[in-house]
Amino acid sequence: MRIGILGQGLAGTALAWQAHWAGYSVHIFDPGSQDGASWVAAGLINPIVLKRKRLVQDAHHHMATMDRFYARVTSELKTSLFYPGPVYEVLPDGASLRAWEDLALDTAFAPFIGPCHPLPHAALQGEAMGEVLQSRRLRVPHYLAASRSFFAREHHVHSELVTTLTLGDGRVQLQGQALDVCLLAEGYPGKWTESFFGPLPFAPTRGEGLRIAWDGEPITHALHKNIFLLPDGDGRYQAGSTYAWDQLDAGASEAAREEILTKLQGWFTQAVRVENQWVGVRPTMQDRQPRWGWHPAHPHLGYLNGLGSRGALTAPALSQRLLEALETASGS
């Protein structure tokens, strides 16, 4: 069976792997631009919404599926996909430390709430840092690029924008290619998805982040308080990100830069220099729930969208569900 996948962000790449493991001939259609939301994603795999101290919906299922998925991809690609170490929450005072310890008493949170540790850098302000068990950070650009190379070698990658997509006689014509199945993984704005499935309840969020560096003692831990501070392993760090719901097409802004630096300096007093600033638009839905499914009149057309800022965590399970539905429908 020939399966076409439109888009090669976190959603499309996960779908491609699931299709590959199911034995399909995979055709990826994606221009290869590295400025999409997935390419600038921090890659945090974290079952806890740290800002609100709540669990991601279906956190336990997503974490288990994610473990198996990335282990299998790692075996296929023969490369490391993760930065070392978990994520830590910076606890500013004794009250927040006690609140963290109380979370460990909640049976839902207990598998993910780790011990508290001393702050590892003199410029960090606070009482301690709490370890988020099972958390990690995906090397997103490396994962996407290595996966693209794999599919270019073992399957088919079409580095072009899709301008023609037609349905008929139980097949799909995509850029002149006759396919048995087509999966849309466009992210925002989802042109082809909305043309076939109708309007999606998008509430896209514009995020900005900084790549920073400093002279002196490094940090090797991934940290969160009101923003993240993430070591890239080369003496540089990602700091961010912001959330905005307007001016989605605008470039990097001075306001976002100042917001990030002000928040960071509230708990990390080290003097830093900004080396780069990035912008991405997260394909978030109004209710923050992803959307996926198969077309009622065209059962060979499906889609996956709306992963928001949790794509590294949720793409494995959601892509698996979509492919399982296809296999059930086809009787394979």
Description of each model-found segment:
Residues 131-177, 181, 185, 190:
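Helical element adjacent to the flavin cofactor pocket in flavoenzyme catalytic cores
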Residues 1-11:
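Beta1/beta-strand and adjacent pyrophosphate-binding region of the FAD-binding site
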Residues 3-5, 26, 237:
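Conserved hydrophobic helix-helix packing surfaces used for dimerization/oligomerization
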Residues 11-22, 31, 39, 44, ...:
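Active-site substrate-recognition segment that forms the wall
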Residues 43-126:
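Dinucleotide-binding Rossmann-like beta1-alpha1 core, especially the glycine-rich loop
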Residues 53-65, 130-146, 251-256, 313-314:
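Short beta-strand to alpha-helix junction loop
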